């Protein structure tokens, strides 16, 4: 079981902003999962990987694949209180789900 969080590298988020957006995505996708995968993921140590995307369109393409695969996922839009304009798409989380299923969506992306 794992979760992959894909964050945009093209919008110049500072380290703190990046950390916050990754956390938002992780929690939102966790909440999208059913009780069985949530329990399994928590019991297995909540494995996560943070990956890099280069555009908003790339995040939406990945989200579409996750949707078609029936995987829990969440797209995060920033509230715009600090560094980014309101509504800026910043991150996508896929999973928790079996590693192989998450990799079908995010397996070709580089580490952040």
UniProtKB/Swiss-Prot annotation:
The gene is pth. GO terms for molecular function: peptidyl-tRNA hydrolase activity. PANTHER family: PEPTIDYL-TRNA HYDROLASE 2, PEPTIDYL-TRNA HYDROLASE 2, MITOCHONDRIAL. SUPFAM superfamilies: Peptidyl-tRNA hydrolase II. It is found in: Cytoplasm. InterPro entries: Pep_tRNA_hydro_II_dom_sf, Pept_tRNA_hydro_arch, PTH2. Its EC number is 3.1.1.29. GO terms for biological process: translation. HAMAP family: Pept_tRNA_hydro_arch. This is Peptidyl-tRNA hydrolase.
């Amino acid at each position: 079981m794992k979760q992959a969080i894909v964050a945009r590298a093209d919008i110049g988020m500072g380290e703190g902003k990046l950390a916050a957006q990754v956390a938002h995505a992780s929690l939102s996708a966790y909440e999208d999962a059913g009780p069985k995968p949530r329990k399994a993921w928590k019991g297995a140590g909540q494995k996560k990987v943070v990956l890099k995307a280069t555009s908003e369109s790339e995040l939406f393409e990945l989200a579409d694949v996750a949707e078609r695969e029936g995987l829990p996922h969440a797209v995060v839009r920033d509230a715009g209180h600090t560094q980014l304009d309101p509504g800026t798409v910043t991150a996508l989380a896929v999973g928790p789900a079996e590693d192989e299923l998450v990799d079908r969506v995010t397996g070709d992306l580089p580490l952040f």
